């Protein structure tokens, strides 16, 4: 492999901010924050959804924050988005 062209593949601490679940895995993500976990310092990546909080994996329904995205879409496109497609 050529030197200097590949991203740094290292252990990173991921924290699910919705339930404070933490896990370490290898990643190339770039982050400025670090955190201590099990006596070792890792680069820190904060995520909103993980397997510990996603409804598919937990079997429980939780309200996900998607309403903001829908409202943003409606504000941007207005009534054009609700019109029916014309068949050719």
UniProtKB/Swiss-Prot annotation:
A GO MF annotation of the entry reads:
structural constituent of ribosome
A GO CC term assigned to this protein in UniProt: ribosome
UniProt subunit comment: Part of the 50S ribosomal subunit.
* Family of this protein: Belongs to the bacterial ribosomal protein bL31 family. Type B subfamily.
- A Pfam family this protein belongs to? Ribosomal_L31
Q: What is this protein called?
A: Large ribosomal subunit protein bL31B
Q: Which HAMAP family match?
A: Ribosomal_bL31_2
Check the record and name the InterPro entries matching this protein: Ribosomal_bL28/bL31-like_sf, Ribosomal_bL31, Ribosomal_bL31_B, Ribosomal_bL31_sf
Q: Which UniProt keywords apply?
A: Ribonucleoprotein, Ribosomal protein
**Gene Ontology BP annotations:** translation
